[in-house]
Protein backbone atom coordinates (compact mmCIF):
# COMPACT_ATOMS: atom_id res chain seq x y z
CA UNK A 1 0.00 0.00 0.00
CA UNK A 2 1.27 3.43 -0.80
CA UNK A 3 1.67 6.12 1.77
CA UNK A 4 -1.02 8.75 1.59
CA UNK A 5 -3.54 6.54 -0.15
CA UNK A 6 -6.79 5.47 1.44
CA UNK A 7 -7.26 1.87 2.27
CA UNK A 8 -9.47 0.04 -0.15
CA UNK A 9 -12.97 -0.77 1.03
CA UNK A 10 -13.49 -4.32 2.16
CA UNK A 11 -17.04 -4.49 0.87
CA UNK A 12 -17.66 -5.21 -2.75
CA UNK A 13 -20.10 -2.97 -4.45
CA UNK A 14 -23.29 -4.59 -5.74
CA UNK A 15 -24.07 -4.39 -9.42
CA UNK A 16 -27.16 -2.30 -10.17
CA UNK A 17 -30.44 -4.22 -10.33
CA UNK A 18 -31.78 -4.76 -13.78
CA UNK A 19 -35.50 -4.66 -14.37
CA UNK A 20 -36.58 -6.83 -17.23
CA UNK A 21 -38.74 -5.02 -19.76
CA UNK A 22 -42.34 -6.24 -20.06
CA UNK A 23 -42.89 -8.91 -22.67
CA UNK A 24 -44.58 -7.65 -25.79
CA UNK A 25 -48.09 -9.06 -26.09
CA UNK A 26 -49.28 -10.26 -29.43
CA UNK A 27 -52.71 -11.30 -30.54
CA UNK A 28 -51.81 -14.96 -30.05
CA UNK A 29 -50.71 -14.76 -26.44
CA UNK A 30 -52.72 -13.21 -23.68
CA UNK A 31 -51.18 -11.74 -20.54
CA UNK A 32 -53.25 -14.17 -18.44
CA UNK A 33 -51.75 -17.26 -20.02
CA UNK A 34 -49.23 -18.08 -17.23
CA UNK A 35 -52.07 -17.93 -14.71
CA UNK A 36 -54.10 -20.45 -16.73
CA UNK A 37 -51.10 -22.77 -16.91
CA UNK A 38 -50.73 -22.60 -13.13
CA UNK A 39 -54.39 -23.48 -12.72
CA UNK A 40 -54.00 -26.48 -15.02
CA UNK A 41 -51.02 -27.67 -13.02
CA UNK A 42 -52.96 -27.27 -9.80
CA UNK A 43 -55.94 -29.17 -11.19
CA UNK A 44 -53.69 -32.03 -12.31
CA UNK A 45 -52.22 -32.30 -8.85
CA UNK A 46 -55.58 -32.84 -7.14
CA UNK A 47 -57.02 -36.33 -7.60
CA UNK A 48 -60.12 -36.70 -9.72
CA UNK A 49 -63.39 -37.38 -7.92
CA UNK A 50 -64.19 -41.08 -7.97
CA UNK A 51 -67.72 -42.33 -7.51
CA UNK A 52 -68.61 -45.67 -6.01
CA UNK A 53 -69.54 -48.40 -8.50
CA UNK A 54 -73.05 -47.90 -9.82
CA UNK A 55 -73.38 -44.27 -8.75
CA UNK A 56 -72.45 -42.92 -12.17
CA UNK A 57 -74.98 -45.27 -13.80
CA UNK A 58 -77.74 -44.09 -11.45
CA UNK A 59 -76.87 -40.47 -12.23
CA UNK A 60 -77.11 -41.23 -15.94
CA UNK A 61 -80.49 -42.96 -15.47
CA UNK A 62 -81.88 -39.95 -13.59
CA UNK A 63 -80.56 -37.60 -16.26
CA UNK A 64 -82.26 -39.47 -19.09
CA UNK A 65 -85.50 -39.88 -17.12
CA UNK A 66 -85.70 -36.11 -16.65
CA UNK A 67 -85.00 -35.32 -20.30
CA UNK A 68 -87.56 -35.34 -23.09
CA UNK A 69 -85.34 -35.24 -26.17
CA UNK A 70 -84.95 -38.18 -28.51
CA UNK A 71 -82.18 -40.59 -27.57
CA UNK A 72 -81.60 -42.22 -30.97
CA UNK A 73 -79.85 -39.95 -33.47
CA UNK A 74 -81.99 -38.84 -36.38
CA UNK A 75 -79.72 -39.72 -39.32
CA UNK A 76 -79.10 -43.39 -38.40
CA UNK A 77 -82.78 -43.83 -37.56
CA UNK A 78 -83.91 -42.41 -40.90
CA UNK A 79 -81.43 -44.67 -42.73
CA UNK A 80 -82.84 -47.66 -40.87
CA UNK A 81 -86.42 -46.68 -41.72
CA UNK A 82 -85.56 -46.24 -45.40
CA UNK A 83 -83.75 -49.59 -45.47
CA UNK A 84 -86.69 -51.42 -43.88
CA UNK A 85 -89.06 -49.65 -46.26
CA UNK A 86 -86.95 -50.75 -49.24
CA UNK A 87 -87.03 -54.41 -48.16
CA UNK A 88 -90.80 -54.52 -47.60
CA UNK A 89 -91.80 -52.28 -50.53
CA UNK A 90 -90.26 -54.53 -53.21
CA UNK A 91 -87.38 -52.18 -53.95
CA UNK A 92 -89.48 -49.03 -54.40
CA UNK A 93 -87.95 -45.91 -52.93
CA UNK A 94 -90.45 -43.77 -51.02
CA UNK A 95 -89.97 -40.18 -49.97
CA UNK A 96 -90.37 -39.53 -46.25
CA UNK A 97 -91.47 -36.29 -44.64
CA UNK A 98 -89.36 -35.21 -41.72
CA UNK A 99 -92.41 -35.01 -39.45
CA UNK A 100 -93.36 -38.59 -40.35
CA UNK A 101 -89.86 -39.78 -39.45
CA UNK A 102 -90.01 -37.87 -36.16
CA UNK A 103 -93.41 -39.37 -35.29
CA UNK A 104 -92.12 -42.85 -36.08
CA UNK A 105 -89.02 -42.24 -33.97
CA UNK A 106 -91.10 -40.98 -31.03
CA UNK A 107 -93.32 -44.06 -31.17
CA UNK A 108 -90.43 -46.49 -31.50
CA UNK A 109 -88.50 -44.93 -28.60
CA UNK A 110 -91.62 -45.03 -26.41
CA UNK A 111 -92.08 -48.71 -27.32
CA UNK A 112 -88.46 -49.53 -26.50
CA UNK A 113 -88.53 -47.67 -23.18
CA UNK A 114 -91.70 -49.50 -22.12
CA UNK A 115 -90.27 -52.84 -23.23
CA UNK A 116 -87.09 -52.28 -21.21
CA UNK A 117 -89.11 -51.24 -18.16
CA UNK A 118 -91.22 -54.41 -18.33
CA UNK A 119 -88.23 -56.65 -18.97
CA UNK A 120 -86.36 -55.11 -16.04
CA UNK A 121 -89.35 -55.90 -13.83
CA UNK A 122 -89.09 -59.49 -15.07
CA UNK A 123 -85.43 -59.59 -14.07
CA UNK A 124 -86.27 -58.19 -10.61
CA UNK A 125 -88.96 -60.86 -10.25
CA UNK A 126 -86.28 -63.48 -10.90
CA UNK A 127 -84.25 -61.87 -8.05
CA UNK A 128 -81.62 -60.54 -10.46
CA UNK A 129 -80.36 -57.07 -11.25
CA UNK A 130 -78.85 -57.93 -14.63
CA UNK A 131 -81.13 -57.78 -17.64
CA UNK A 132 -81.04 -60.96 -19.73
CA UNK A 133 -82.42 -61.73 -23.18
CA UNK A 134 -84.92 -64.11 -21.62
CA UNK A 135 -86.37 -61.17 -19.65
CA UNK A 136 -87.06 -59.25 -22.85
CA UNK A 137 -88.59 -62.34 -24.44
CA UNK A 138 -90.80 -62.91 -21.40
CA UNK A 139 -91.96 -59.29 -21.38
CA UNK A 140 -92.91 -59.48 -25.05
CA UNK A 141 -94.70 -62.78 -24.47
CA UNK A 142 -96.70 -61.42 -21.53
CA UNK A 143 -97.71 -58.34 -23.51
CA UNK A 144 -99.41 -60.44 -26.15
CA UNK A 145 -99.62 -60.23 -29.91
CA UNK A 146 -100.74 -56.61 -30.23
CA UNK A 147 -98.55 -55.06 -27.55
CA UNK A 148 -95.48 -57.24 -28.07
CA UNK A 149 -95.51 -56.96 -31.87
CA UNK A 150 -95.67 -60.62 -32.71
Curated annotation (Swiss-Prot):
SUPFAM superfamilies: Histone-fold. It comes from the Eukaryota. Histone H3-like nucleosomal protein that is specifically found in centromeric nucleosomes. Replaces conventional H3 in the nucleosome core of centromeric chromatin that serves as an assembly site for the inner kinetochore. The presence of CENPA subtly modifies the nucleosome structure and the way DNA is wrapped around the nucleosome and gives rise to protruding DNA ends that are less well-ordered and rigid compared to nucleosomes containing histone H3. May serve as an epigenetic mark that propagates centromere identity through replication and cell division. Residues 53-150 are annotated as: H3-like. It holds the Pfam family Histone. It comes from Xenopus laevis (African clawed frog). Component of centromeric nucleosomes, where DNA is wrapped around a histone octamer core. The octamer contains two molecules each of H2A, H2B, CENPA and H4 assembled in one CENPA-H4 heterotetramer and two H2A-H2B heterodimers. CENPA modulates the DNA-binding characteristics of nucleosomes so that protruding DNA ends have higher flexibility than in nucleosomes containing conventional histone H3. This is Histone H3-like centromeric protein A.
